Design a protein with these regions (language model features):
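A glycine-rich beta-to-alpha transition motif near the start of alpha/beta enzyme domains, typified by
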Residues: 1-112, 161-164
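ATP-dependent small-molecule kinase catalytic core of the GHMP/sugar-kinase superfamily
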Residues: 2, 91, 98-164
């Protein structure tokens, strides 16, 4: 793998390696992405994000890859980091990012503070990509001596398990 420049950022505890590929493109294999994301031998991050050239609609295209090298459709915290870079660079207070599935509207609401609209979340379990069959009734977590039960799955571009 050849050398390349990147930015490492974090948003609410998630960290990202962000590669600006608008002018100079590099091809990264799944193995390369896993190596970059590796916390012991690589840079270390939750996700790798590519910033790609502006599309015909004026939006900047971005790609997200989890640390296992799998591509996902969106990440809220990662989108906020990319939006902050681009809005600072372009000296604007709003920008639209495009992923392969959606448009993400981003707005600067203060110094180093970005708000995004990721669209309507999907709560349909059958439409959320999970790798195994899951019995929601038996899925409980214990945190600080408190049991969290009755989770919901939601997809906003990347599947999440949430508790209300």
């Amino acid at each position: 793998m050849r050398e390349f420049k990147f930015i490492k950022m974090n948003g609410l505890g998630n960290d990202f390696v962000i590669i600006d590929q608008r002018k100079n493109t590099i091809s990264l294999s799944k193995k390369d992405i896993v190596s970059i994301c590796d916390r012991d031998d690589g840079v270390g991050c939750d996700q790798l994000i590519n910033i790609l050239p502006r599309q015909d609609d004026g939006n900047i295209l971005i790609e997200f890859f989890n640390s296992d090298g799998e591509e996902i459709h969106a990440c809220g915290n990662g989108s906020r980091c990319v939006a902050d870079i681009l809005m600072t660079e372009e000296n604007v207070n709003s920008i639209k990012l495009s992923t392969k599935e959606k448009t993400i509207s981003c707005q600067k609401i203060g110094d180093n503070c970005v708000s995004i609209d990721m669209g309507i979340p999907n709560f349909e379990l059958k439409e959320i990509p999970v790798k195994t069959d899951i019995d929601l009734n038996s899925l409980n977590f214990q945190i600080n001596n408190q049991v969290l039960a009755n989770p919901f799955f939601v997809n906003v571009g990347n599947p999440h398990v949430i508790f209300f």
